[in-house]
Amino acid sequence: MAAAGGGGPGGPGTGGKIRSRRYHLSSGRTPYSKSRQQQQGIISRVTDTVKSIVPGWLQKYFNKQEEEHDRVHSASEVIVNDTEARENNAEHHIYVVDDDDDEEGNSPTDGRVTPEPIINVDEEVPSTSQSAINNTDALTRPSLHRASLNFNIFDSPALNCQPSTSSAFPIGTSGFSLIKEIKDSTSQHDDDNISTTSGFSSRASDKDLAVSKNVSVPPLWSPEVDRSQSLSHNSSMTSKKPTFNLSAFGSLSPSLGNASILNRQLGDSPFYPGKTTYQGAAAVRSSRVRATPYQAPLRRQVKAKPAAHSQQCGVTSSAARRILQSLEKMSSPLADAKRIPSNSSLSHTPEKNVMDIPENPSKRKKVESPFPPVQRLVTPKSISVSANRSLYIKPSLTPSAVSNTNSRRIQPDKHNESRKNNLQTTSQSHSFSYPKFSTPASNGLSSGTGGGKMMREKGSHYSTKPANEELDGPVLPEIPLPLSTAALPSFQFSTLSGSATSPISVTKPANSTTCRLTSSSPSFTFSSPIVKSTESNAQSPGSSVDFTFSVPAAKASSATSDESKVSAVSRAAKTHAAVSSAKNTDDEQLGFCKPAKTLKEGSVLDMLRSPGFSSSPSLLTSASSLNRSTPTLSKTVGNTFSPANVSLGVGSKQAFGLWQCSACFHENMSSDSNCISCSALKPRPTETSKKLPASPPSSNTKSTVPLSSTPGLGDIFKKPAGMWDCDTCLVQNKAEVTKCVACETPKPGTGMKATLLIPSTTKSTNPATNTLAFASCSASIPNEEMFKKPMGSWECTVCHMQNKTEDNTCVGCKAEKPGTVKSVPTAAPSGLLGLLDQFKKPTGSWDCDVCLIQNKPEANKCIACESAKPGTKAELKGTFDTVKNSVSVAPLSSGQLGLLDQFKKSAGSWDCDVCLVENKPEATKCVACETSKPGTKAELKGFGTSTFSSGTAAPTFKFGVQSSDSTAELKSGASTSGFAKSIGNFKFGLASASTTTEETGKKSFTFGSSTTNEVSAGFKFGIAGSAQTKPDTLSQSTTSGFTFGSVSNTVSLAPTATSSGSTGLQVAAVIADSNLATTATLKSAEEKKAEAPTITPFSFGKTDQNKETASTSFVFGKKDEKTDSAPTGSSFAFGLKKDGEESKQFLFGKPEPTKVDGSAASAGFAFGVTNPTEKKDIEQPGKSVFAFGAQTSITDAGASKQPFSFLTNVSSTAASSSTCGVSSSVFGSVTQSSTPATPSNVFGSAISANAPAPSSGVFGNLTPSNAPAASSTLFGNVAPSSTPSGSSGLFGTAAASSTPATSTSLFGSAAKLSAPASSGGVFNSAAPAAPASTASSVFGSVASSTNTSANSANIFGSSGGAATAPGAFVFGQPASTASTVFGNSSESKSTFVFSGQENKPVTSASTSVTPFLFGAVSASTTPAAPGFNFGRTITSNTTGTSSSPFIFGAGASGSASSSITAQANPVPAFGQSSNPSTAPAFGSSTSVPVFPAGNSQQVPAFGSSSAQPPVFGQQATQPSFGSPAAPSAGSGFPFGNNANFNFNSTNSSGGVFTFNANSGSTTQPPPPGYMFNAAAPGFNMGTNGRTTPASTISTRKIKTARRRK
């Protein structure tokens, strides 16, 4: 760390201990003295190590060194006036530092490796800063004094904020730490009030934390600028946010620290200091705005203070100072405002080292203020800005930030003088005072900018250009257009250069240039280009002249001549104007294009309509003799205007050969004989019009029209004689037309009609009717004649429209002609006769007063609203009383009968008064709202309500309406459910609660509604329905339809309660009228009110509680339980055992409790749901909803029903034996009930019941029952039962029963029965049967029977445990039993066993085959061949047959040594430890583990404390997850199991692979079969895999990381 820097508290490691102030005048050290790194003690090293962990923005308070060895204190340099400084704390006195005394003035730079030479202005002698050698982090401590704000911030980088006690003016790049401010008593008092948060009132400012001078380990956190490579002043502009210092993990030399040359952090830019940022060096090179407007050179008075103490902050603790320092670094409005540049003299833009260009301050890194935000305000002081203030540039190779500081400490006159000299050399050729960048430093970086980004040598943008620099226009070659006018129209925008029209000549027929086919350009030009023909124009006849817009200073082509030019001006005209062609040549010497000197007049259309755009040679020829009608600028020497007295465009049209159609006034080419628009004939030319030459004229002749006859500019817009304006549409018409060409309005003034009537298709013989006649002023009509009324016309007094003489009525408003009898007009004046005739109302038609529809005269009623015709009797209609006007409304004249005929109402149709819907004549009610037809008896009803006239009324479609009816009579807005024979309505989001007792309605498709009446609801989605039915209707048996995932509870008030909770997706509904069995259809079903058994349809997750015997439909993995009544027909049951039991509906994940007393209720499809039946004489059990990870404890007399309890421990301690609770433990919950309860175990929960209760284990539950109960285990549950019960194990469950019961093992469940029972093992379930039992093992299940006379049907790889029963197929298991089924092993014949080992039975009369246990290890005293056990160990101590089905990662342990009748070998559920006594839930604290528990009697669950060995994370007696397994039988390949292969552990028994586990079992297992990842024990997290006996595994030793020196 820093070897020098301020005098810190002495004694390394002493912290903020108060010590006396000492003066350390460390002038004895040489500038190049080595750092004292080797002299550190142990305490200082510890302190340095602690400091290296602290980030750099906190280290600035650690890095105060004990003494300031790098500063030379001289009494002559310091004006010690402590009293004056304390009195005038706010005023900072300026003192002069002599440069002679400053030769060895040292200041901490910014932690660079090599000392930078400090160039003084007057001496240019490099003085070395010895603090720059090892001062790595002393620069990161800004002072907390606001007095340092009055520095030039340019000279005070944000990095170098350490207050210095040196009297010499520092030279380094530090500005905030140039002079150590001595705080007066006021500031100390302020600091005392700032924070006294430290526990001890230490003068933390006086006693900072002690640090050693040289720290061997660099700080872990350091500011960004500490790592910057450049020594330019811009390093101070980079942010001081803490960045990770890579040098803490090793650098070139420990003494270098983060000042190592190789210490370039990730992301540092090689071209400018700091990280690579957006915009690169441009972002770094930004102007800094000082906190105060003082400029360099700045002279400040140093207050005397003890040099030993680096900082005075009163009693502010170091932690408080760090907090305040962090606050200073944060962005604040005040800090942001300080960055805003100001143009006032108070805040003059400070000089930069290189250039004074103010840049965007938002790009600039934040210059931190080293003062806490709580001290006194620093007010800017006005300074006088010198006029000759310019930039001082030091032409040295040293970094400019170093050389800048010394140079600014000279006197102002010296400084200004030197800056003037430098300015003359650097920026003498520029008009602004911003010089170029200085010479790049020797390190490759630009010494002025801090960036070395690849930039131009000129680093600045010049705001002005020299006046003499003007861009010359490019000399463009004359490139002819390689296309001819035969393919393209010739664009000719030029008047020919050199043409000068005579002031007296009007038309000039061309002589010389018109004989050329190339001279095809019209004389009209835009004002900009002067087009000259090139050589290729004469070479290719018919080619258009090139035209180019003018470019300045272009040279003329030497090959141009008068003959090669396209000229519309004759040579005679040139001669008459006395224009020399030499002058034209001189004017055109500038280029082939020249700006026009006059603005040509005329229309663009005149040029575009010229024959030059036509490919006809005659037109091209004739176009060359143009009559220029524009006043052209004669190209004389004087450039005077000679306007030609030619009208605009008339002569040019004639010269172009255009003629105007007399019919449509379209201008046509001269070659067109007919108008191209209306096909009218071309009019014959008259003597007043110009003759267009059909061939090139051969002589220069003037036009025959005298100048006096040339029309003026106003004559152009005069109307030709005889033309008239339409009074209707104001379109100008020709004189010969009698109707307007636009609206066909007759010509006004019928008195002139006979004389002016000329067919529009004939050409005019009258000179006044010529289209070009408006060009001559002799045929012009005066303005008063133009607007004169036609003779005989009359003006309407109503609409002021001019009418013809023969019209007796106004053509616009139909008003009569004056002089006749007037009629009051009833229609609004429109004025368009021809247009209104099309919309004229037929005679006799009338408008409806109600809907304003026009009707035919013969119609007596309105065709739209059927209102009576005015004058007839009005008919009252419904709620709409038609308002009849006493005065008949005048018919409107704006109707169109033809269009309305399409929408005409059919005869006899009538509109509903309520909904305004049109109905057919034969309809007596509205088809929409069923309102009676007007005239019939109206019924009182609400708006839009349905009318049920019969029992079979159509259903209504209702959205979101909640209907509730409690009576059987029809109510307004009531739903149709509950009414006799009413077809179910489609209801969306509707909740209908109907408690009618007589009739039950059919309910159809319902979305999300809850129907709680006694009738079964139809298709319902996701709603819970709860209904209370009356005692008289409780005998009805209802069947719920397809319900999806809901629980329907029915609280019966009588033992005969019947509830139909349809809360899920009910597809079918059952009505209580018939015993119609409905399957999963959308049809409604009926069921009788009688107690006849009904079949419930497909239901998803729904529970129906019925007291009656009902056959349920498809049940997926659900156990059906019936108690007393005879079973009825059941539908498809997936994985369901129906043996004397009723079928339940398919319930998906929901418990379904049903009454048990009279008959078994039918439940729908139940996935993992138990349907326990209830006794009819017991109270209704309460239901607990889904409890995730909660522990439910029911102590009331009524047994509770816990549907889905994940990680919950459901314990029912009710002592009342009269209540039969229906508990449903779902997914790993343990339900312990000491009272007769019906546990429903779902997915890995263990249920222990000591009372007669139907238990239903679903998906990996263990349901041991010692009382008569119907246990139903689903999917990997173990249902051992010692009492007569119907157990059905589904999908990997083991159902063990010692009494005659029907057990169904489904999919890997083991069903063990010691009594005559029929066990059906399905899919890798082991069903050991009693001697008189028939075991049906399906797909890898083991049917073990203590009696050899058991009839076992092993299906697909299941092993029969009897001596005569074939063994089940165990994937990777030794084949030890005889098998006759595919994949089973037989004693006489061993079949193929995948990776299994054939094993013969040893000591047992009946060999049991462990089925396919995926990853489980089966350990029993009898050598049982373990099946495919996935991560699971099955241990059995029974001498009888032990069979475990497919258990996925679960451990099963039977600790009872008695026969199977007492305790069956349980088949654990998914990851569950099956203990016949108790099995805890996942996360519940019980005596038996659930999830991946070890095989012990009472192994606690995950995270629970128990006296038994823990399950998850501890070593149980049986190995848990990650603990060694001790299989006593042939074990399969335990993939990742704690088997015999001990990774890093000892194994006492040769076994299989065990990863980091210790197998403490002493039994020698047979050669292991394939056990895929079979680890029966639970996951022992952090138990080192040790069993109860101490293992030889040494515990891991975790070492803390230490950083090497």
Curated annotation (Swiss-Prot):
Binding site for Zn(2+) 3: C796, C799, C810, C813
Major localization listed first in the record, in broad terms: nucleus
Biased composition annotated in UniProt, kind: Low complexity: 1519-1529
Amino acid composition bias (Basic residues), ranges on this chain: 1596-1605
Biased composition regions of type Basic and acidic residues, renumbered to the chain: 410-420
Binding-site list for Zn(2+) 1: C661, C664, C675, C678
Molecular-function annotations in GO: DNA binding; nuclear localization sequence binding; structural constituent of nuclear pore; zinc ion binding
Region 33 X 2 AA repeats of F-G: start-end pairs: 249-1556
Sites where the protein binds Zn(2+) 2: C726, C729, C740, C743
BP terms from Gene Ontology: mRNA transport; nuclear pore complex assembly; protein import into nucleus; RNA export from nucleus
Binding site for Zn(2+) 4: C848, C851, C862, C865
Tissues/organs with expression: Egg (at protein level).
Compositionally biased region (Polar residues): 27-44, 194-203, 397-409, 421-432, 497-517, 697-711, 1499-1518, 1581-1595
Keyword Zinc-finger: yes
Ranges of Gly residues composition bias in the record: 1-16
Sequence repeats, residue ranges: 249-250, 656-657, 943-944, 959-960, 988-989, 1007-1008, 1021-1022, 1044-1045, 1100-1101, 1116-1117, 1134-1135, 1148-1149, 1167-1168, 1188-1189, 1227-1228, 1243-1244, 1259-1260, 1275-1276, 1291-1292, 1307-1308, 1339-1340, 1356-1357, 1371-1372, 1382-1383, 1414-1415, 1430-1431, 1448-1449, 1470-1471, 1482-1483, 1502-1503, 1512-1513, 1521-1522, 1535-1536
Cofactor info, note text: Binds at least 4 zinc ions per subunit.
Subunit structure, interactors included: Interacts (via C-terminal domain) with the nuclear receptor kpnb1; the interaction occurs in a RanGTP-dependent manner. Associates with the Importin alpha/Importin beta receptor.
Described purpose of this protein according to its UniProt entry: Component of the nuclear pore complex (NPC), a complex required for the trafficking across the nuclear envelope. Functions as a scaffolding element in the nuclear phase of the NPC essential for normal nucleocytoplasmic transport of proteins and mRNAs. May be involved in the retention of unspliced mRNAs in the nucleus. Probably mediates tpr anchoring to the nuclear membrane at NPC. Possible DNA-binding subunit of the nuclear pore complex (NPC).
Written domain comment of the UniProt record: Contains FG repeats. FG repeats are interaction sites for karyopherins (importins, exportins) and form probably an affinity gradient, guiding the transport proteins unidirectionally with their cargo through the NPC. FG repeat regions are highly flexible and lack ordered secondary structure. The overall conservation of FG repeats regarding exact sequence, spacing, and repeat unit length is limited.
Family: Belongs to the NUP153 family.
Protein name: Nuclear pore complex protein Nup153
Organism name: Xenopus laevis (African clawed frog)
Lineage: Eukaryota, Metazoa, Chordata, Craniata, Vertebrata
Gene symbol of the encoding locus: nup153
